[in-house]
Amino acid sequence: MALVPGDHGSTFGGNMLTTAASYAGTKFLIDNDIPGQVKDMEPYLLGALNDLKGRFSFVTEVRGKGLLAAMDFDSDISGQVLTAANEAGILLNGPRPHTIRFMPPLNITREEIDEGVDRLGSALATI
């Protein structure tokens, strides 16, 4: 099957501005070895979150890939956790009533992970 003119296209595809923005974003990722940083930070983040799992019996699982991570609870408390985390200055997501999700910036540092996990630990202690 062949495409004929008008079968496939996009409003902004090939636009010079979006092409330049895409190039700049890709160049930044490559020049700053963002994939390498993510690979280095993944075990650090998951390890820190698993440390919290060891401290709080209601945390049942920590999982993730790269810097996208989730924490499961033994009951539907993600709303409470999100509220407490927000009050502690952490923005998280609650995709399920018993799950919270972490999506930190790809250039996060160990110090920032430590600060975020400390704040999350304080939030979990209020549950």
Q: What spans do the regions from the language model cover?
A:
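Conserved N-terminal phosphate-binding loop of PLP-dependent enzymes in the Aspartate aminotransferase
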Residues: M1-I127
